[in-house]
Structure formats: structure tokens, C-alpha cells
């Protein structure tokens, strides 16, 4: 019996790994020109390059990060433009996940993140595969890549990963849930598109409220307090992930 269970688990794991590998292939086939060194023309990225030029020049001339920019909307903090954080751990995790050439890497994040969400909901691998395809190739998610809304694409792409961990917490799989959700939410916040993060936090709040409505009596209070506590822990861990010590830190 144990051998049978182990065999089934190994078979499912192999299938899931093959599906994830197929996501790499699908992403590269869809954006085939990147294989010949071509780059997609993104209007927002052209504007970003001009806006961030002052930051690049300051970095090259003074070997330090400027934290204020004069030529963007009459002045604004550079953390919303192109500041570099040398000790950003999640940035390194993001680069590992997005190992494909741009913009195929964004499509891969869409596919992988939504696949992990569906698997956390115990959806069959074949259904999860087609569900991921439907999500990743939805019209809007492709359009925003064309115009260069890269941070928005990344914030949307990592949201299902955070949601996968959140569902695990709701289903009392707290340890794995906290780890996955904190990393996913950290990556989502680290994408630096706070509008999408704001919408996503609203979604998580609604899911938490709706999930407690199905509980009764003492279970209602217990689940709400427990889930709320773990969710708060996730948020704190996510913020710790993206916090960046500098020489100006207290």
C-alpha cells in the first residue's frame, strides 16, 4: 500500500514538473523572436529610460543611490522609478524565477503562479494546466506587456502565488501556507506596483471574510482569530523581505 501511494505521488510530481517545463517552452514559442535576440518595443519602457537617466548618471558619477528625482512629475522619490537595492533578497529570487528572456519571463510567471494556485486548491494537474493557459493568455495580461506595464504584469503575475499560500492557511496547512504566502506576497509587493497590491489586499480580505461565514459557533471565532493572526504574520514577513537596510538606517 505504501509503495502504491509513493508511486502515485512520484507520478504526480513528475507530471507537475513536466507541465512546468512545458510552460517554459510555451513562453518561448509565443515570444519566439526573443530567441534571435530581438526585443519587444515597449513605449512605457522608453519613457522610463528617459526618466531614470538622471538616476543612472548620479550612480555612475558618485557611486551611490540617489533617493530623489527632479525630472519626474516635479520631483518624486526614486524608489518608485529605478533605485537599486544591493541586499534585496527577493530580487534575487525573482531573477531565478524569471530566467527566460523578456517578455517570455513574464508569461512564464503568469503560467507558473496560477498553476501553483490551482494545485493548492487540489485541482487535477491537467485541469490546472489548461486553467493556467486561460489565465496567462487572457487579453489584458498580454496587452500590458506590449505597452511596457512590466511592474503591473509582475504584480498581477505573483498574486496567484500569494493566494495559493493564503488558501493553505485557510485550510489549516499553516506552515507551508505562511512560507508560500509570505514569499509570494513579498514578490508581489517587490514588483513595486502598489495599485495592484492594494487591490490584491482587498481581495484577500474579502476571501477571509467569506471563508469565516461558513463557520459556526466557536469555530467561527477560532478560525477568524487564527487566520487573522497568520495573515498578519505573513504581511510582516513580506514587509521584512522587501525592507532594505541602508547607511541611513537607524
Segments predicted by a language model, with ranges:
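Single conserved hydrophobic/aromatic residue that forms the stacking wall/gate
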Residues: 240, 244-250
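Transmembrane-helix signature of polytopic, membrane-embedded enzymes
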Residues: 118-137, 172-178
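Membrane-interface coil-to-helix junctions
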Residues: 27-117, 133-160
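Short hydrophobic alpha-helices at membrane interfaces in multi-pass membrane enzymes
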Residues: 168-186, 220-229
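Specific aromatic-rich, kink-prone transmembrane helix
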Residues: 155-171, 183, 203-210
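Perimembrane helix-loop-helix junctions
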Residues: 198-237
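Membrane-interface alpha helices of multi-pass inner-membrane proteins
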Residues: 25, 178-193, 233-236
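Start-transfer (signal-anchor) and selected internal transmembrane alpha helices
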Residues: 1-30, 218, 223-234
Amino acid at each position: 500500500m505504501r509503495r502504491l501511494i509513493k508511486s502515485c505521488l512520484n507520478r504526480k510530481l513528475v507530471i507537475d514538473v513536466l507541465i512546468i517545463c512545458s510552460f517554459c517552452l510555451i513562453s518561448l514559442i509565443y515570444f519566439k523572436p526573443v530567441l534571435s535576440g530581438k526585443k519587444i518595443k515597449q513605449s512605457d519602457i522608453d519613457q522610463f529610460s528617459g526618466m531614470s537617466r538622471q538616476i543612472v548618471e548620479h550612480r555612475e558619477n558618485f557611486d551611490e543611490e540617489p533617493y530623489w528625482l527632479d525630472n519626474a512629475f516635479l520631483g518624486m522619490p526614486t524608489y518608485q522609478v529605478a533605485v537599486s537595492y544591493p541586499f534585496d533578497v527577493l530580487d534575487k529570487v525573482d531573477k531565478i524565477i524569471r530566467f527566460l528572456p523578456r517578455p517570455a519571463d513574464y508569461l512564464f510567471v503568469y503560467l507558473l503562479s496560477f498553476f501553483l494556485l490551482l494545485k493548492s486548491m487540489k485541482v487535477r494537474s491537467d485541469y490546472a494546466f489548461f486553467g493556467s493557459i486561460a489565465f496567462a493568455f487572457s487579453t489584458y495580461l498580454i496587452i500590458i506587456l506590449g505597452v511596457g506595464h512590466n511592474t503591473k504584469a509582475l504584480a498581477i503575475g505573483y498574486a496567484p502565488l500569494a493566494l495559493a499560500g493564503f488558501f493553505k492557511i485557510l485550510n489549516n496547512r499553516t506552515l507551508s501556507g505562511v512560507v508560500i504566502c509570505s514569499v509570494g506576497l513579498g514578490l508581489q509587493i517587490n514588483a513595486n506596483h502598489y495599485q495592484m497590491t492594494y487591490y490584491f489586499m482587498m481581495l484577500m480580505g474579502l476571501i477571509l471574510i467569506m471563508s469565516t461565514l461558513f463557520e459556526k459557533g466557536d469555530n467561527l471565532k477560532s478560525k477568524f482569530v487564527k487566520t487573522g493572526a497568520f495573515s498578519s504574520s505573513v504581511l510582516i514577513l513580506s514587509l521584512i523581505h522587501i525592507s532594505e537596510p541602508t547607511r541611513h538606517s537607524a
